Every structure is written in C-alpha cells, then in structure tokens.
C-alpha cells in the first residue's frame, strides 16, 4: 500500500486520540507518558507492567481510560491468600438444574488491573500470565475466550519487597512494556490538590468504543516501516546480547542476559503504535528511541557487578541507543 494512502487512513482512524486525551485529562492531571503507553498496549494487544509508589493515580488512570473507551474494567488486588479460581472463575453446582455451571472470574473484562502482582504466589501469577498469553481460560472442562480487546495492566511497588514473590524473568518477558511511573511536577501536584479538595466529582464520558479500537489495531499493523528501520531494531536487540560486536565491550561485564526475540517483535509493534498516536503512517528512528527503554528495561538482565556499581538497565539501554548507528 502507498505511504500516502496509509497516512490518510491513519489520520482518519486516529482522530479519537485528541478527544480521548482531553476526556482523560478532565480526571487525571499529568501522567501523559503512562496514558500513552497504556494506549500503545491497547493498540497492539501487548500487556503493560506499571512500577511506581502508591498514590500516583495508576488505578484511577486505568479506570478513567476504560470509561472513556466504553470498556469493562476489573481490578484484582493480589494478596498472599489469593487462589487461581479467584481470578479465572470456578464451577458451581446449580441444584435447581442439577448441573455444574461456570462462574466467570474478574479476568473476563477488557481492561484488567492486577494490583501489586508480586504479592501473590507463583501459581496465581502463572494463572494470570497464562490468560494473558492464550487469551482464553479453562473453567472446569470448558474453555472460554476472553473478550476483545483484552489488556492486563499489572502494578508492583518498588519499595516494599518484604513478603513479595518477585516475577521471574520468563514471566516479565510476557509484558510488552514496563513503565516507571514518576511523581507529578510541582504545578501538577497543585492542580491535583485543588481538584481533589474542591468537592466536585468529575468522571470521563465515552468518546470512543471497543469497535473503534479494534479498527485502529488493524490500521496500526499497516503503518509503514522501512527495511532500514527493521534492521535498526534488530541491531539494538542484538547489541543487548553481543555488545562487543557493536563496539560496546565495556558493557559486557554488566549484561548477564540480553533481550529475547520478543523484544524485536514488541519494538516493531510499539513503534508503529507510537507513530499512529502522532497521526503518522510511517515509523521513524525517533519512534524506536521513544519507546525503546520501556520495551527493553525488564528484558536486559544485569550482572551483580552492575548492581554493585549502581548501573541500571536504563543506563545500559541508553548507551546502546547512543552507539548503535541510526539509519
């Protein structure tokens, strides 16, 4: 398809983005990067891991987005005594009909917020992650498809690590993006304080539908990506595994494991969605750089030496982007 045709198509299908941002902005002050990353997840079918201290409007943001997109929202608070059946559902006996009937769990929603995912044991985490991967769950002996669109946003608190069950690397890899949610600016905090103490109850109205998101998804897949951009993505991911081959020998002692092929796939998809949100029908290297850290930060596993020298995965990824040749 011609790039001009794709551009026109993207312009038409991405018209809801500004309306959505304005509607969410009625409730949420700031956090534009987090909102954009969640939208990228929605447009690509990739799940999102949010890391940040309590009170940064993570839950409220997801709830507001679901209202603005007319989607079903469910929040699951993960605790040590949670069971897989509490998430996916179970079968109950109907005495009137003398049969077992399925009782669907909170996973049957469009937007699912798994709050403090690292507070539940591994069997509960794996039940959720299986649903994320397969987009279906088995209750009793019947398999049920999950609704579309389906997006899981999991949160974890970076401070309190006592009594938590850290997500293994294999499960972290299933999240398309890992977002570090930061504090608001001074001006934003003043606006938050004024808004929350004014006594006004503001909520978001629906400005888009799940059908529009489904249509936008098909357009995102058509966003043009040049061969050189594809090679650039592969070079970035390859540099996490073989830094010496890219003239980054000093990083070899700091990287224990590089990113998996999922990183290349997700960089490709996320870059297309990033371009779509800017009403562009083609991907530029800036799109790759903009979402690169969020795609790679949980996939580059550092050595103890890196931790001892207080070198973070973000530092390593930035060095990779500085040294790998831009097309």
Please provide the spans of the model-predicted regions:
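Pre-Walker A (pre-P-loop) alpha-helix and adjacent loop at the N terminus of AAA/AAA+ ATPase modules
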Residues: 9-56
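P-loop (Walker A) phosphate-binding loop of NTP-binding proteins
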Residues: 53, 87, 155
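Conserved alpha-helical scaffold flanking the Walker A/P-loop in AAA+ ATPase domains
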Residues: 37-40, 93-113
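Walker B catalytic acidic pair
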Residues: 52, 115-116, 127
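Walker A/P-loop
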Residues: 42-79
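Canonical AAA+ ATPase core
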Residues: 94-99, 116, 120-124, 132-223, ...
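Conserved C-terminal "switch" segment of AAA+ ATPases
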Residues: 6-14, 27, 178-250, 277-281, ...
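C-terminal engagement/docking regions of AAA+ P-loop ATPases
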Residues: 1-10, 242-327
């Amino acid at each position: 398809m011609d790039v001009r045709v794709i551009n026109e198509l993207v312009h038409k299908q991405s018209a809801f983005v500004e309306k959505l941002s304005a509607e969410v902005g009625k409730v949420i002050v700031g956090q534009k990067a987090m909102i954009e990353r969640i939208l990228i997840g929605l447009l690509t079918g990739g799940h999102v891991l949010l890391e940040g201290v309590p009170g940064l409007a993570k839950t409220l943001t997801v709830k507001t987005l679901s209202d603005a997109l007319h989607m079903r929202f469910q929040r699951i608070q993960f605790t040590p005594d949670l069971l897989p059946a509490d998430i996916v559902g179970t079968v109950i006996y109907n005495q009137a009909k003398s049969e077992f009937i399925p009782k669907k769990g909170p996973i049957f929603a469009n937007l699912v917020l798994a709050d403090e995912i690292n507070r539940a044991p591994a069997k509960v985490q794996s039940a959720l992650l299986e649903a994320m991967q397969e987009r279906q769950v088995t209750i009793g002996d019947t398999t049920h498809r999950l609704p579309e669109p389906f997006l899981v946003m999991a949160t974890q608190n970076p401070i309190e690590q006592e009594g938590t069950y850290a997500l293994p690397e294999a499960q972290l890899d299933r999240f398309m993006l890992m977002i570090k949610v930061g504090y608001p600016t001074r001006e934003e905090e003043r606006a938050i304080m004024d808004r929350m103490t004014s006594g006004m109850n503001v909520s978001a109205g629906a400005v888009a539908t799940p059908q529009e998101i489904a249509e936008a998804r098909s357009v995102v897949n058509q966003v043009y990506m040049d061969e050189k951009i594809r090679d650039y993505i592969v070079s970035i991911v390859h540099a996490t595994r073989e830094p010496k081959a890219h003239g980054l020998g000093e990083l070899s002692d700091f990287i224990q494991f590089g990113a998996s092929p999922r990183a290349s796939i997700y960089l490709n998809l996320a870059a297309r969605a990033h371009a779509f949100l800017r009403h562009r029908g083609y991907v530029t290297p800036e799109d790759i750089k903009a979402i690169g850290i969020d795609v790679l930060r949980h996939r580059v596993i550092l050595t103890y030496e890196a931790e001892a020298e207080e070198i973070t995965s973000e530092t390593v990824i930035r060095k990779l982007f500085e040294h790998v040749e831009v097309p």
